[in-house]
Amino acid sequence: MRTAIFADLHDNYTGLTTVLEDAADQKVDRFVFLGDAGHQPRILAALQVRKIPCVYGNWEVSGLRRFPEALAEWVGAWPAILHEDGIVYCHASPDMPAALPTTAVAADWMKPGMSWSALFPRLHQNTNAVWNALAWMETHDVTIAFHGHTHVQMVWVWELATNQLRSFASLERVRLAPGTRTIVGVGSAGVPEDGPWPRYAIYDDDARIVLMRCLRDD
């Protein structure tokens, strides 16, 4: 199965349609969205009508009460993570508090003055958070984690036998190797910070390959 994973639209409807069109050209079988859609109802409606599985990000938590009632009920039920066989999808890190399973619960829990970074760390700037994510993956027997939030594409590969952690930017393809745990930052479809073009990832679980898509105009 080929899964297109994208994140961080931040009200960029053109970014959404660009990713959807490219992914269709790449013959993906399904989509997963990793949070921070924005506050435009039409973006949320586009995700909803396509029945795209979504996890919540900080924008959903902070903006939940701005949405129309029907959308708020749907977004409020988004989970913190999607955990499949050997795979996890999350906004910032899979190491999320078990007490915050949905957007609505997280929105009720957050109070003024609380640190967003504690709940949504930026992995490319926080090595401890990377190791916490890898520890969660090891505990839950997860081989690969996909995340957004950082707005950059980046990959971490932890080799279990040597305890060596390597990070990579600007990769076009990642092949999952035995005896490793891999974290993939899919980049931003709406507001990328590693260039002006929308970015996302495609995971082919049969080939065990991740394609890092960068949608240049040319």
What are these regions (language model features)?
Residues 1-50:
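N-terminal active-site segment of His-dependent metallophosphoesterases
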Residues 33-38, 122-129, 160-172:
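A short, flexible low-complexity segment enriched in Lys/Arg and Gly/Pro that occurs
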Residues 23-28, 84, 138-141, 202:
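Glycine-rich phosphate-binding loop signature in dinucleotide/nucleotide-binding domains
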Residues 1, 87, 181:
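Alpha/beta-hydrolase fold active-site loops
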Residues 4, 144, 156-218:
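Acidic, His/Gly-rich catalytic cores of divalent-metal-dependent hydrolytic chemistry
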Residues 41-146, 150, 154-159:
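Conserved catalytic scaffold of divalent metal-dependent phosphoesterases
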Residues 7-9, 35-38, 58-60, 92-94, ...:
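Active-site metal-binding loops of divalent metal-dependent hydrolases
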